[in-house]
Every structure is written in structure tokens, then in C-alpha cells.
Amino acid sequence: MNKSKYELNERISAILINPYLSIDEFNINCNLIKKYNIKNISTTLNYISDVKKSLGNHKVKINTLISFPLGDLPSIVIDQMIDYSIDQGANGIEYLPKFFYLSKNEEEKFANDIEIISKKKLPLTLIFNQNRMR
């Protein structure tokens, strides 16, 4: 296999979040991740250990999606989800902030939530929907 052929794939993130995946579909996705040398995966808490097991020695960063897609979880639940992600061996957090705070002009609460999460042990990526930000 020509390594340069898949060089761009190392910058692409695979997303495994479908709650209706069969185990066969899940394994097909993981095999494609290995085949195309995908290096980043965004997934749910439920899939972290299965992704790690299925990918074996394939070097990949597994990021957990928190508060996605609605951005409406209570802070205590978010904190527990992040702790669980850490325990399961996730490499990062992808977080959808509570934009509702901004609509109520509560920028400080919005920023405080993000600050608390950013102090955890994992790198943090914020998810923004550009179309909703206009």
C-alpha cells in the first residue's frame, strides 16, 4: 500500500455514534479505520472500550463526545461523563457547550462551564455549529 495515498486520512476524524450499529457494522467501521489509517475517532461513552478492543494495536486518538448533539446536560452529569471517559482511556473530550446561556446573556456561566471542563486531564475541543452562530 502506498503510504502517501493515505497521508491525508491521518488528519480525518471518524465518527462512531450511531446507537443502532450492529456488531458487524461496528467491526466494519473499525476495519475501515485501520485500512485507511484514520488517526482520530469521535465516539460515545458506550463505544470507547469496544473501539479500543477492535482496533487493537492501531494507533488512534479516541475522543469522547460530551453533551452532543443537544448541549443541555447538567454540569454534574458532564463531570461524571468526563471522569468515565478518563477511566476508559479516552484521549480527548469533544464538548458541545450550553449555548442557551448565551441566549440569556449569561456569558459568564457559558465561559465557566468550559473553564471547568478544560481543567480536566484531557484535551478539550469545543463543538460549534457555524450556521447557528449567525
Give the positions of each predicted feature.
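Hydrophobic faces of well-ordered beta-strands that scaffold small-molecule active sites
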Residues: L8-I17, K39-T43, V60-F68, N91-Y95, ...
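Electropositive, surface-exposed helix/loop patches at the edges of structured domains
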Residues: K5, L102, L124-R134
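Non-catalytic positions within long, well-ordered alpha-helices that form the structural scaffold/packing
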Residues: K34, I86-G89
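Conserved alpha/beta-domain cores
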Residues: N18-I28, I33-S54, V60, T64-I66, ...
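Conserved, mostly hydrophobic/aromatic
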Residues: S13, V51, S85
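Active-site-adjacent beta->alpha loops and helix N-cap segments on the catalytic face
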Residues: T43-K61, D72-D79, F100-S118, R132-R134
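Alpha/beta catalytic cores of nucleotide-metabolism and tRNA/nucleoside-modifying enzymes
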Residues: M1-N27
